[in-house]
Amino acid sequence: MKRELEGSYESERKRGVAQVKAEYVVGAASNVRVDEEEAGSERFVQGEFGGKKNKKKRGQNKNRDNRQQKETHALCPKYVLADVTNQVDLCTFGDNCRFVHDIPTYLEHKRPEITDSVFKTCPVFETLGYCPMGFKCRFLSSHMDKETHKLLGEYPSDLASASHEINHITQDQKYDLIKKRFPFSKSELVLEILDSFQEENREMHREAEKVKEDQQDNEDEQKEKAPQVVQRELEAQKRRQRQKDLYLQYKDTRFFAQEKKPLDLRHKKIVSPLTTVGNLPYRRLMRTLGADVTYSEMALAVPLVQGTNSEWALPKAHESEYPGFGVQVACSKGWQASKAAEALATYIPNGISEINLNSGCPIDLLYRQGSGSALLDNPARMIRCLNAMNYVSGDIPITVKIRTGTKEGHPIADTLVRRLVFETDVAAITLHGRSRQQRYTKVADWDYVSQVAKALRQAEADFMESPQGKESHHDEKTRHTQFVGNGDIFNYTDWYQHLEDPEVDSCMVARGALIKPWIFEEINAQQHLDKTSSERLEILKTYSKFAMDHWGTDEYGIALGRRFFCEFMSFFHRYIPVGILERVPVQLNERPPLWKGRDDMETLLGSSDVKDWIKLSEMFFGPTEDSFVFTPKHKSSSYK
């Protein structure tokens, strides 16, 4: 009988079903879908950029649009913090302004205040002593004199610096990028150097045909040439001569190697870069729960170079994130990588611990453009990007995140890391133990991650014995490129098991930290923590407060905070309480039968219905706005 039970248990486990105690089971296995894309990857859907739209995969809402509407009767920005006792016309547009100038009129048309939230007063005002949303705040009565309509609190002259957020850039700095006034002097030089190396390689391959070309050149010289042709040839000769001079000057040097700030990732608790859900409030939450290192959402290099507002919002961080905050950049060419890194290093040098090149993103659109994991198919281009970034980034270290390869069954990371050691000066390499083709359909291959870590250490030893290594590291006995593993870490046993490998410096946690944000507390305690529904609700309250601190407490900020709250819930609800499980730990790819919690709130927190996520959001953000729209990633349900 015991064998039969064990066989049944193993059979269930093989099917990837989490074992829930019988008294909590209410139905068959739930239909939890495996994510084939990075979290929140709708930013990069083909349909948004024109051309043919992809076929929808596995019931995903690939073209969802969760942008929120703004106020119908919006208050003029010049009057948001105005003194109502002073009737001076603050707006230069006067009667031509499309916004409301009369504050009492605005307050009459404004949406009702939020009164039935767990926040009884404005959470931003409680934190800062003032509310930057002024009259637009949905908790206005907590910081406005009802009789005089005068705002309470002391307002600093520089609201941005007083918000406890870092990495802001000025409007003038953005205009320099938009108007192409930013000099990019370092980028221009390093790109010339890299071009000279490429041209020299091309010339070496053309040697076989040089005789034929010389004969043709002699015939052409006998013919009379137009002045414009002669001028172009002279310019080409000068350009080629400069390339040769640069090549001779730098060919025997590691010109890209620069002195950098120390980067220590050894056994650090690292949260992976996460598109959409890895926003500032979430990262700030993770810092309070034990994370040591956080990364921005993936920023695209070209919009950064162009000064796009939405892209420059991504490197912003809370002051609690630094040191230990990295900015991740995606690009397809060396000039994009170089100029984006130079702009970041010039404008926000004191708020970044590292700049990370994304060479692992599997999203189709970016892959077709040559970004993300497409760089795995072109290691030479990846190396040029890394070297250009390293040259221009000042003292900010450059790191790279890769996958095992692009095709399943054809891993290339073990050979790639050798080239990265010999041909670049990256401070750290993060390896996600899946190929691009796999996405999340199979478990991460940690045996291969371990194999790559050993290959990296062997490459470092070989490099130090080479003439190049002896010359460039003559004061050091060893070279250590930090190596971080990534994939399917969901509990403390996973963490410590992977760190038993001495060649692995640390582990990076992605979906595990979304489903279970207290995972680093478990790692420190070395226990499977059974969080109660009230404790999990407190985590959501903290996230909601951080969301309002960041996006604001006006109508638009509340809608935006609610939207990202629902994005967070799309992962957070997948947690299965330890107390209702037959066995622990549960693996990330295991799904439970339909279950009920130990109390009503626990059941609500585990619901996959978007309407229940909205219900939870109303506890913190007040009643849902009529215009609020949220479409989840999967087509199981939506809210309008």
Swiss-Prot record:
- Chain intervals with Basic residues compositional bias: 52-61
E.C. designation(s) = 1.3.1.89, 1.3.1.-
| An example Gene Ontology molecular-function term | RNA binding
UniProt cross-references to Gene3D superfamilies, sorted A to Z: Aldolase class I, Zinc finger, CCCH-type
InterPro entries, sorted = Aldolase_TIM, DUS-like_FMN-bd, tRNA_hU_synthase_CS, Znf-CCCH_4, Znf_CCCH
Q: What is its main location?
A: cytoplasm
Q: Which domain of life is it from?
A: Eukaryota
Any Pfam family: Dus
The alphabetized UniProt keywords are:
Cytoplasm, Flavoprotein, FMN, Metal-binding, mRNA processing, NAD, NADP, Nucleus, Oxidoreductase, Repeat, tRNA processing, Zinc, Zinc-finger
Q: What are the start-end ranges of the zinc fingers (C3H1-type)?
A: 70-104, 116-146
Gene Ontology CC, one term: nuclear periphery
Under catalytic activity, the entry for this protein gives:
5,6-dihydrouridine(47) in tRNA + NAD(+) = uridine(47) in tRNA + NADH + H(+); 5,6-dihydrouridine(47) in tRNA + NADP(+) = uridine(47) in tRNA + NADPH + H(+); a 5,6-dihydrouridine in mRNA + NAD(+) = a uridine in mRNA + NADH + H(+); a 5,6-dihydrouridine in mRNA + NADP(+) = a uridine in mRNA + NADPH + H(+)
Which cysteines link up through disulfide bonds? none
* UniProt biased composition (Basic and acidic residues): 202-215, 222-236
Which residues does the Swiss-Prot or TrEMBL record annotate as the active site?
361 (proton donor)
**Subcellular location, record wording:** Cytoplasm; Nucleus
Q: Which cofactor does it need?
A: FMN
UniProt region (Disordered), positions on chain: 37-70, 202-236
Positions bound to FMN: 273-275, 328, 401, 432, 486-488, 510-511
One GO BP annotation here? mRNA processing
Q: What function is annotated for this protein?
A: Catalyzes the synthesis of dihydrouridine, a modified base found in the D-loop of most tRNAs. Specifically modifies U47 in cytoplasmic tRNAs. Catalyzes the synthesis of dihydrouridine in some mRNAs, thereby affecting their translation.
Give the family per the record: Belongs to the Dus family. Dus3 subfamily.
**What is the protein named?**
tRNA-dihydrouridine(47) synthase [NAD(P)(+)]
The species this protein was found in: Candida glabrata (strain ATCC 2001 / BCRC 20586 / JCM 3761 / NBRC 0622 / NRRL Y-65 / CBS 138) (Yeast)
Protein encoded by which gene: DUS3
